[in-house]
Each structure stands twice: as structure tokens, then as C-alpha cells.
Design a protein with these regions (language model features):
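Accessory alpha-helical DNA-binding modules that contact the DNA backbone or grooves
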Residues: 173-247, 259-284
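Long, highly charged, low-complexity intrinsically disordered interaction regions
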Residues: 106-109, 113, 117-197, 211-217, ...
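Intrinsically disordered, low-complexity N-terminal regions enriched in serine/proline/glycine
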Residues: 35, 39, 64, 150, ...
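Noncatalytic, basic helical substrate-engagement surface that gates or grips nucleic-acid strands
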Residues: 1-133, 144-159, 235, 242, ...
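A general marker of short, structured functional hotspots
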Residues: 32, 36, 57-61, 76, ...
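Short Gly/charged-rich anion-binding patches and loops
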Residues: 89, 138, 261
């Protein structure tokens, strides 16, 4: 299974190349999909397009989640309303015309889709190799499963970490500034309000890691509360069961379009360069 982080793949190119033309963005997205499908289909099988749905459950749990992104987009010189319109349009075109399952669900991010599908391969009788196509280091935690690998399109190399479990624990303690999640020594509003976070020492994290089974006893009440906050937001095993079930059910029940749709679609959208290599869109 190839799990492609749709928004991350698309936005990384759009931001770098300052794209806002519908045809150029469509071509860029389709060409990326073609390239990764060709590269990994024979070893990893079917590709799954994993997309961000609206109204993520993390925002309900933690209102500050990714709050800075909206502010940063407002200050950007790119037309984000138009960019998201195109991303949504192309995602639906892929669902209707390309031979891939597209998982796009209300309340779920691509992280949830990738996490749930990767974890599902640990169930009896469902083991298969998994390749995650994303530069997001949040997925390092999934490397604890021997069948899961990750390729970074931005760095153009495999993402590797010697100890995924330790990485995940440190990530929880340190928080994630890009997602508006403070470290566990700092209050909920630290990043959104520009409040300086309380410094986090390596020694403190190591002490907590050595006593991970007794955190409630060795942390202050506030530290433990913030640890639980960050664990819920960062640890993919914390995805609510209802969302995990929705993702798995959608994946298992969704039908994919016939191969013949691909060529007709590329002709209709005048993707002339891609027409020449249409077979590279087919599953392995």
C-alpha cells in the first residue's frame, strides 16, 4: 500500500513555485502521483490518496490547533481561496477518474487516514508493506512497525529514525510549533499569543522517558495535564476510535474507477505530456 499525503505533496510545490494556475497545479499534482506510483507500485501495490477533511477533531479538542496557519495565509501574497478551490477540485477529479481510493472524511486529517491505515496492517491477516509519501516527520512514530517505510518528497530521500518510539515521546514533550502545540511546560495559548515557552531541557526529557510508566507520579499536575494534551494531538494511536473505524470502513468499501477513465480524463484536461505515459498511473 502506498499512502500519499495529498495536501502535503500539493502545497509543497505550490508554495515553492508560487503556483496559482489551475492547469499548472493539476499537472503538478498528477505528475507527482504518476511518479510515485511508478516508483513504488510493484513493491507496495495500490496507491491511496489521503486528504485532509474539514473540521478536524483536533480543533474541537484543542481550539489553538494550527491557529497560526490561518493568520500566516492572510499575510501571504498567494490567493489561498483559489488554491484550496483547485486542490479540492483536483482531488474530486482523481476520485472520479484515477484508479486509486481517495479517503477524504469530515473531521479527519490526512495524518489520521495514514495512521489508521498503517495501524490496520498490524491486524491479523492484513499485513502488507506500506510506503508513506510525505515529508511530515509526524509519521516517524509509525516506523515502529517493521512493514512501514517513508519517503520525503522535499528532501528526496527516505525518512529514517533509529528509535521511532523515543522520537514520538520527545515530540510529545517538545510540542509542535507549526501546529500550534506548545511544549508540555507551557500553557495552551503560548504559541497563538506569542508567549515565550518555558525552555525544555534534554535532561528533563530523558528523565521522563526513563520513567515513562510513572509520569503521573513524577510530573507536576500541570505538566501531566499538558503531556496528555500533546499526546492526544500528536500520538496517532490516540485517534478517536469512531474516526479510525470510519477511515477503515471507507477504505474497504470504496470502489475505484476503471483504467479506461484515466486516458479520457487526461485528454479532456489536455495533459498532453502525461498522456504519453498513461500506463504509469495504473496500479501495480
Amino acid at each position: 500500500m502506498i499512502l500519499l499525503d495529498y495536501s502535503q505533496i500539493a502545497l509543497s510545490n505550490i508554495i515553492v513555485q508560487k503556483l496559482n494556475d489551475e492547469n499548472m497545479i493539476r499537472h503538478m499534482i498528477l505528475n507527482s502521483i504518476r511518479m510515485y506510483n511508478k516508483k513504488y507500485r510493484h513493491e507496495y501495490g495500490q496507491m491511496v490518496i489521503c486528504a485532509d477533511g474539514a473540521n478536524t477533531w483536533r480543533k474541537d479538542y484543542f481550539p489553538q490547533y494550527k491557529g497560526m496557519r490561518k493568520k500566516n495565509r492572510k499575510e501571504s501574497d498567494q490567493d489561498w481561496t483559489e488554491i484550496f478551490r483547485i486542490l479540492n477540485l483536483v482531488r474530486e477529479e482523481i476520485r472520479e477518474n484515477l484508479p486509486y481510493k481517495v479517503i477524504h472524511l469530515e473531521g479527519c486529517e490526512a495524518d489520521d487516514v495514514i495512521g489508521a491505515l498503517a495501524m490496520e496492517t498490524q491486524e491479523f491477516g492484513k499485513h502488507e508493506p506500506v510506503m508513506i509519501i510525505s515529508s511530515d516527520k509526524d509519521f516517524i512514530q509509525l516506523h515502529k512497525y517493521n512493514n512501514v517505510k517513508q519517503y520525503s518528497p522535499i528532501q528526496k530521500k527516505m525518512v529514517v529514525d533509529k528509535n521511532p518510539r523515543t522520537y514520538c515521546f520527545e515530540h510529545i514533550c517538545k510540542g509542535d510549533k507549526g501546529d500550534g502545540i506548545p511544549n508540555i511546560l507551557s500553557p495552551d495559548n503560548a504559541i497563538m499569543e506569542g508567549i515565550r515557552q518555558t525552555p525544555m531541557t534534554k535532561k528533563k526529557i530523558e528523565y521522563w522517558a526513563e520513567n515513562a510508566d510513572n509520569l503521573k507520579d513524577i510530573m507536576t499536575q500541570e505538566e501531566y495535564r499538558n503531556y496528555q494534551r500533546n499526546k492526544t494531538l500528536i500520538d496517532l494511536s490516540e485517534i478517536p476510535e469512531s474516526h479510525q473505524a470510519n477511515i477503515i470502513n471507507t477504505f474497504e468499501e470504496q470502489k475505484v474507477p476503471m483504467k479506461m477513465n484515466v486516458l479520457n480524463y487526461l485528454i479532456k484536461k489536455r495533459c498532453n505530456l502525461l498522456i504519453e505515459c498513461v500506463e504509469e498511473f495504473y496500479n501495480g
